[in-house]
Amino acid sequence: ATYKVKLVTPEGEVELEVPDDVYILDQAEEEGIDLPYSCRAGSCSSCAGKLVSGEIDQSDQSFLDDDQMEEGWVLTCAAYPKSDVVIETHKEEELTA
């Protein structure tokens, strides 16, 4: 399945179609959208975003704890969409504050 992923970035909103077996960060890059990242392995906070609505699968990530995930934190480099989603990007400073 392919889902609509809306990214709310500091530069504005952007919408892309992301298959459910492709990481959101990877698809964004393919479409020329510049998102922050570092490790690309789900083990740091560089790519962190906040899930506004929808459902993702980020079981590959190892950085966020259960409480953070319940609060809606998402690592875009290790997140697959499981429904149409809206994510606020560029949130690392807020997460690590």
UniProtKB/Swiss-Prot annotation:
One of its GO terms (biological process) is ferredoxin metabolic process. [2Fe-2S] cluster binds at C39, C44, C47, C77. Its cofactor is [2Fe-2S] cluster. Residues 3-93 form the 2Fe-2S ferredoxin-type domain. Its main location: plastid. GO terms for molecular function: 2 iron, 2 sulfur cluster binding; electron transfer activity; metal ion binding. Binds 1 [2Fe-2S] cluster. It is found in: Plastid, Chloroplast. Keywords: 2Fe-2S, Chloroplast, Electron transport, Iron, Iron-sulfur, Metal-binding, Plastid, Transport. GO terms for cellular component: chloroplast stroma. Ferredoxins are iron-sulfur proteins that transfer electrons in a wide variety of metabolic reactions. NCBIfam families: fdx_plant. Belongs to the 2Fe2S plant-type ferredoxin family. This is Ferredoxin.
